[in-house]
Amino acid sequence: MSTADRTAPVTVTVTGAAGQIAYGLLFRIASGAMLGPHTPIRLRLLEIPAAVASLEGVAMELEDGAFPLLDAIDISDDPWTGFAGANVALLVGARPRTAGMERADLLAANGPIFTDQGQAINAVAADDVKVLVVGNPANTNAFIAMSNAPDVPAERFTAMTRLDHNRAIAQLAKKTGAPATEIHRIAVWGNHSATQYPDLTHATVAGRPARELVDEQWLREDFIPTVQQRGTAIIQARGASSAASAASAAIDHIHDWVLGTPAGEWTSMAVPSDGSYGVPDGLISSFPVTCADGAYRIVEGLEVDAFSRERIDASVAELTAEREAVVELGFAKG
């Protein structure tokens, strides 16, 4: 492709850009895995001041990759600079949970971060910005950012449950012996937390209903808790949280949002509710969605049985409590 044939670069901002998830993410973005093989990228890397020196090293490695699609790399510790002109914003950085910290403490610690980032996105990001929050608690951090960006359409703010979706696919593939490519229409509902509900009700394996291939005991006592607790299991096994798999899921999320889901397929994204399936309006909750033309739509009309209803309601209750907590703390409006 000649220089004259190249499209204008897409500006991609990544926060927490010196961290482990970003390290697994940035090189794949630069390679074209996220936005396709013909889309040039301008990377804006955002970090806290103490991590900028480390980030310089990451930028050097990106340069050394000589990626044909990587037009430019900018480094900043200022959100108002880092989000300038952003078409895609991946909010990876967040205050991690430390020993003795309750979930309420985590919400209080992350509130100012996502308030500032939401305000910066509102002021300086591109008109077509798409936001994915990866940093936990992702759903509620996304709600805070969205609440502080009143001029950006609410549907542009999403949180990542694609990692949970991919984990669910992997567990079903392992159980049935089918390749992941033969598994379709899994759904993840609710919060990206241990209350999430990975749902096989409508899933298929090589065209057969998944529920015909697995027993109820495995579903309830193995599959669901394994997916819910997978992050904890990885921490216990490797002594660090999921990084490469989280990065891969972020790539998948943006790729499908921008370029579309395959015909007849859906994925899982945490998006502002429109009231579907009894989830309160505006709550950022995971749903099965389809994507086309740069937009997502919640899959409509799915049957929700009593077991699923109970699981969805439990996760939504947790999200509602988190929303009430950040409203009370002054980070968002109810």
UniProtKB/Swiss-Prot annotation:
Pfam families reported in the protein's UniProt record: Ldh_1_C (PF02866), Ldh_1_N (PF00056)
Catalysed transformations (reactions): (S)-malate + NAD(+) = oxaloacetate + NADH + H(+)
Binding site for NAD(+): 16-22, 110, 117, 134-136
Class in the EC hierarchy, top level: oxidoreductase
GO terms classed as biological process: malate metabolic process; tricarboxylic acid cycle
Molecular function GO terms recorded: L-malate dehydrogenase (NAD+) activity
Enzyme Commission code: 1.1.1.37
Keywords linked to the UniProt accession: NAD, Oxidoreductase, Tricarboxylic acid cycle
Superkingdom to which the source organism belongs: Bacteria
Residues annotated as binding substrate: 97, 103, 136, 167
Positions annotated as active site in the UniProt record: 192
Described function: Catalyzes the reversible oxidation of malate to oxaloacetate.
HAMAP family in the record: Malate_dehydrog_2
Family: Belongs to the LDH/MDH superfamily. MDH type 2 family.
Protein name: Malate dehydrogenase
